[in-house]
Amino acid sequence: MPNSERHGGKKDGSGGASGTLQPSSGGGSSNSRERHRLVSKHKRHKSKHSKDMGLVTPEAASLGTVIKPLVEYDDISSDSDTFSDDMAFKLDRRENDERRGSDRSDRLHKHRHHQHRRSRDLLKAKQTEKEKSQEVSSKSGSMKDRISGSSKRSNEETDDYGKAQVAKSSSKESRSSKLHKEKTRKERELKSGHKDRSKSHRKRETPKSYKTVDSPKRRSRSPHRKWSDSSKQDDSPSGASYGQDYDLSPSRSHTSSNYDSYKKSPGSTSRRQSVSPPYKEPSAYQSSTRSPSPYSRRQRSVSPYSRRRSSSYERSGSYSGRSPSPYGRRRSSSPFLSKRSLSRSPLPSRKSMKSRSRSPAYSRHSSSHSKKKRSSSRSRHSSISPVRLPLNSSLGAELSRKKKERAAAAAAAKMDGKESKGSPVFLPRKENSSVEAKDSGLESKKLPRSVKLEKSAPDTELVNVTHLNTEVKNSSDTGKVKLDENSEKHLVKDLKAQGTRDSKPIALKEEIVTPKETETSEKETPPPLPTIASPPPPLPTTTPPPQTPPLPPLPPIPALPQQPPLPPSQPAFSQVPASSTSTLPPSTHSKTSAVSSQANSQPPVQVSVKTQVSVTAAIPHLKTSTLPPLPLPPLLPGDDDMDSPKETLPSKPVKKEKEQRTRHLLTDLPLPPELPGGDLSPPDSPEPKAITPPQQPYKKRPKICCPRYGERRQTESDWGKRCVDKFDIIGIIGEGTYGQVYKAKDKDTGELVALKKVRLDNEKEGFPITAIREIKILRQLIHRSVVNMKEIVTDKQDALDFKKDKGAFYLVFEYMDHDLMGLLESGLVHFSEDHIKSFMKQLMEGLEYCHKKNFLHRDIKCSNILLNNSGQIKLADFGLARLYNSEESRPYTNKVITLWYRPPELLLGEERYTPAIDVWSCGCILGELFTKKPIFQANLELAQLELISRLCGSPCPAVWPDVIKLPYFNTMKPKKQYRRRLREEFSFIPSAALDLLDHMLTLDPSKRCTAEQTLQSDFLKDVELSKMAPPDLPHWQDCHELWSKKRRRQRQSGVVVEEPPPSKTSRKETTSGTSTEPVKNSSPAPPQPAPGKVESGAGDAIGLADITQQLNQSELAVLLNLLQSQTDLSIPQMAQLLNIHSNPEMQQQLEALNQSISALTEATSQQQDSETMAPEESLKEAPSAPVILPSAEQTTLEASSTPADMQNILAVLLSQLMKTQEPAGSLEENNSDKNSGPQGPRRTPTMPQEEAAACPPHILPPEKRPPEPPGPPPPPPPPPLVEGDLSSAPQELNPAVTAALLQLLSQPEAEPPGHLPHEHQALRPMEYSTRPRPNRTYGNTDGPETGFSAIDTDERNSGPALTESLVQTLVKNRTFSGSLSHLGESSSYQGTGSVQFPGDQDLRFARVPLALHPVVGQPFLKAEGSSNSVVHAETKLQNYGELGPGTTGASSSGAGLHWGGPTQSSAYGKLYRGPTRVPPRGGRGRGVPY
């Protein structure tokens, strides 16, 4: 097809009708020789091919007429690469190889060749000799020199030959000159490029028997082959349009068959046919024979991948092989480039003949062709040049012979011929060129190939076409039909296989050729038309139906018997050409007869081309159907890569890329239809594929392409439909090991989800192993207490985007409103014993499930335990989890589990651990639920082990026999031996819970209870989750670890700002800066607002106005709720709300505070401004100095100064309230001036302040104050003097301190009433300013709480420093950040909780009263909210120092004193609820490095 069309085009371009006829005889003889040579090659390589060719010969002859281009072997071989049709490809390749071999052998001995073939052989021999001499000269010279030399020689020869041809006929001359040019060009290419090409071909073909045979001969052959190919390529536009012929591969196959028929039809029709059918059968379809080379080449070429592969491969490999530089050679020598350069440059002498003879269109074509090919298919360019090289090699062989024969007369005639070609051929070329230009416009990339092929091919092709037409006429029409059918079948297969790929290029090629060939064909067409006349109607079918029908016949085609089927198939194909012709009538009808065969191959292509523009989808469909053939490219790499890359590279790579892209689009649309087509194609390929390799490629290609498409489709459904953009991201709620966690809403269902981001950009080794583990494990864990992973989505629409730009995956989890750490640190909630039972029951059920599934969680901590508002617990974050084999004792890393929850065996270096490690972590959480803060808070492994030893006893062989076997036992064991005092420290918790805690925190892992045993414990066995009332959780605020961290940082930053800046303004600024954020965290604020409200409404209004501006809606709502509910409350009422009333002393103090507040409200508000400055400064100083500020006075001062800054006032009020409480409690605890000393140190210690910041929400004071009633029992200060002092101090301080505090509080409250809510929210900022560091309790910020918070925070970081500054005063409990943090934390937790959760506040206060009774009374009176802080501060000091809280703090922090102190235990027990809150979170918030 390509040849005939190209011939037609070339003929038209070369010399109109006469050109066509003359070239037919001359070119036909050379073509027949080439075919002869190819046939001999083919026979030499395969008698099968000869037989098959013989069978196909009739069809080939007829198709040769119609599909001459396909017959061109070099064309076909390059086209075969281009074509998806492996048969054609194989045939081309075989023919090329055989031609190469046969070029030599043909020279030596012409196998059965018709006169044409013999004459061609003679021409080829002459040309070969010339080429050999040229090659020798070019070999002597550089490859470029060879190319240029051969081009010049070729140009000269072409000129001579062109002149001779001009004498013969302008068309023949133009064609022959073009052929000669192409020959010389290809000779040059062959010489320089052919060596490389033969090398690359050998490399490629080495896998092929043909290649192996040819490779040695190739250099000698390669010129011949290139000449032969050249002539054949010239004969068939397919050579010129190899890149296109890739797509035309079927056409080309047919063309090669037809062309062989052409060449053979007169005398070597059988041979040519034998070549063609075997070509079809073995090369095109018998991918096995040539399956790797022709079939896989073609099909690979057909397949976008093979094409691309072959194209790029050929560029660098095959093309560079053929031409020194695939691009350079192509550009200079490539049919398009060389034509362009020839027509445009001195080389034009030859090229001008071709391009001129071809016509401006050709030059345009070559320019547009080469441009497009260069631009669109640089890869194809190389492919094209290889294509052309094949044309040049095959046509070049013929042309070189012709040139040599004509050389004598051609020298003079060439110049004339050039001129004549320039004019006559140029005009037809112009006409064709206009059509071609349009075609090239349609597919310039395809056109460049077809143009090149046509340019070289038209001359030879016209001759060949005419010759073939004569031969075809001479030969049986049946043969023609068979050849046509075979060609068409090949074309169909190629079109089907390549159709998608090649059909576009082919269509362009053929369309391009069509104009020229149409003219030529018009002259030539009459004979072939009758053959195709009947078939034309099916043309429409040709694109899809013939592809499918030819495929079935194609398998027969491989077998000689299939020739009969081929005629039937030929009708189909003929119909395709006919319809193609009909479609192409303007250009094609004239071509029809010559193009008939071409029409069979090319018309389908043309139809494809025409259809391609519109039926591009169909072509992609063809591609899709071709995709099954695409598997051939895998063959391509071996044998086919060399040939197919050459042929396929130029046009196929670019086209392929485009087609692949189109495929993506088309694939999506046509895939369903094309998959059937592909299925049909694969059948065709399978039949020709009688050779398994092609089928495998087919299957592979489909698997690669279709599956890829399918995968992409699945990807689109999996990725595209479920991309991250399907979720509305609400905000960030956490930070994981490999990314962030976002709260999002599913746009489709409206469901809330958590998106855990898995970032890949920073991953050196791809997908994070932790994420892979988590995904793998979570898919196996389905339990109500294990978080459910719903799906995985990405931030890309499909996988290809992922390759280009590393994106991220998102694990989609069900959304949980809170995590345990956020809730505990928030101070917004207090968990009752029933709640703790429920939580532990669910937690242990989930853990037992994991352990039964043999998974170790290895990272259980409060932040990985999620809760929703209904009280449901889920275990999350399985990034460190792993499968555990109990039967196999193997080492695992001991660097797992967050330090605070890490069991002693891991700290001592155990690597063969068991699920008991998770039970220890759950035991730590159980203690934390009661104490409200982590019970072991250290920042170093050694310190962590020390804390554990102080509470649980030192690890020793007596209690833990195997401990001496642990690696770090000797290096890590505590210097001091401790006895186990866990029961003493936690005596305040229920006995059932204490028993469970004792068992869970057993040092020896072998004696530690299992998850299953915990569920059978008295504490959990009777728990019925369904009957448990859900805890009162803050629905208005999602409490997550990240949120609590931010609050802590804000408070810390505020405190830090306060400390450094001497002026309160900076503190205020800092406070205000932080206030907005703290406001969000101001959940604790509600309790404080209540006190403020109680104090005065005017101050409330003022404070509210300022603070409101800085608060969120949620914060404001909380404050408003608190204010509204508590605005009218009196201090006693506030005390009740805060549970402070439980203590009679507290009530009395609150009443006194109420009175003093009312009296001092006005004066205090004024004084506070002035006082605040001094207090703040003093506070700043105090933080730096362990000395305690005159908490009451300073607090008052700070509060008073705050009026200037409402936020500062709020912060000051909270601080004052805290300090007020602290002074009473902290002074007592400090065993120093209760008024100034205790408060100062607590708050003064920079470390405590920091920790306070860490524990920012020390709003517990109000809540903890209520627990103070339990305080009286604690007052016996069994712990250090602190408790005694606290108990006495509260009473002692209560009068003086209370008066001062009441005054201070009353002043702040006058303003704070409105500010208290703000205080709560703004207070945090204020607290930051007022107190060096925000404590969990806002009150803490001002005084002890701040110190406690700081201590808690610093407990891990700078426990000693805090201990030194505060501990001296505070006692060992305080020394431990735990004690301070407990109090501070309690304050923050309770304070926060008191406002929203009175019950929580009550519990906390129940605990607080111990230390706070007297002192707390004042704080509570002063400001319920502020009082909270104060009470809590005292509670911290007293509770931690005197009571269990202090003990808890100490035990938690690891300070030994209070842990051991029995009084502390009792105090703790009394203050249990309050202190629990205080110690747990405060310490954690501050000390926890979450």
Swiss-Prot record:
Q: Which residues carry this modification: Phosphothreonine?
A: 57, 514, 692, 893, 1244, 1246
Q: What is the effect of changing residue 912 to H?
A: In a colorectal adenocarcinoma sample; somatic mutation
List the GO terms this entry assigns under cellular component, sorted alphabetically.
cyclin K-CDK12 complex; cyclin/CDK positive transcription elongation factor complex; nuclear cyclin-dependent protein kinase holoenzyme complex; nuclear speck; nucleoplasm; nucleus
Similarity-based family: Belongs to the protein kinase superfamily. CMGC Ser/Thr protein kinase family. CDC2/CDKX subfamily.
Q: How changing residue 877 to N affects the protein?
A: Abolishes kinase activity
What sort of enzyme, by top EC class, is this?
transferase
InterPro entries, per database record:
CDK, Kinase-like_dom_sf, Prot_kinase_dom, Protein_kinase_ATP_BS, Ser/Thr_kinase_AS
What the record says about activity regulation is: Inhibited by the ATP analog flavopiridol, purvalanol A, purvalanol B, staurosporine and CR8.
Ranges of biased composition (kind: Basic residues):
34-49, 107-119, 196-205, 366-381
The segments labelled Disordered in the record are 1-703, 1047-1098, 1161-1189, 1220-1348, 1441-1460, 1466-1490
Q: What protein is this chain from?
A: Cyclin-dependent kinase 12
Annotated Pro residues bias: 526-570, 1268-1281
- Known disease link: Chromosomal aberrations involving CDK12 may be a cause gastric cancer. Deletions within 17q12 region producing fusion transcripts with ERBB2, leading to CDK12-ERBB2 fusion leading to trunctated CDK12 protein not in-frame with ERBB2.
Query: Compositionally biased, Polar residues: which spans?
Result: 250-276, 466-478, 1071-1083, 1161-1171
Coiled-coil spans in chain: none
Give residues where Phosphotyrosine occurs: 73
Show the GO MF annotations: ATP binding; cyclin binding; cyclin-dependent protein serine/threonine kinase activity; protein kinase activity; protein kinase binding; protein serine kinase activity; RNA polymerase II CTD heptapeptide repeat kinase activity
Under the subunit heading, UniProt states:
Interacts with CCNL1 and CCNL2. Interacts with CCNK. (Microbial infection) Interacts with human herpes virus 1 (HHV-1) transcriptional regulator ICP22.
Q: Where is the composition biased (Basic and acidic residues)?
A: 1-13, 87-106, 120-134, 142-162, 184-195, 226-235, 428-458, 479-525, 654-666
List positions binding ATP.
733-741, 756, 814-819, 1040
Question: Which reactions does this protein catalyse?
Answer: [DNA-directed RNA polymerase] + ATP = phospho-[DNA-directed RNA polymerase] + ADP + H(+); L-seryl-[protein] + ATP = O-phospho-L-seryl-[protein] + ADP + H(+); L-threonyl-[protein] + ATP = O-phospho-L-threonyl-[protein] + ADP + H(+)
Biased composition, Acidic residues: where in the chain?
Answer: 72-84
Q: Which residues form the signal peptide?
A: none
The entry's localization annotation reads: Nucleus; Nucleus speckle
The cross-link Glycyl lysine isopeptide (Lys-Gly) (interchain with G-Cter in SUMO2) sits at 263, 509, 655
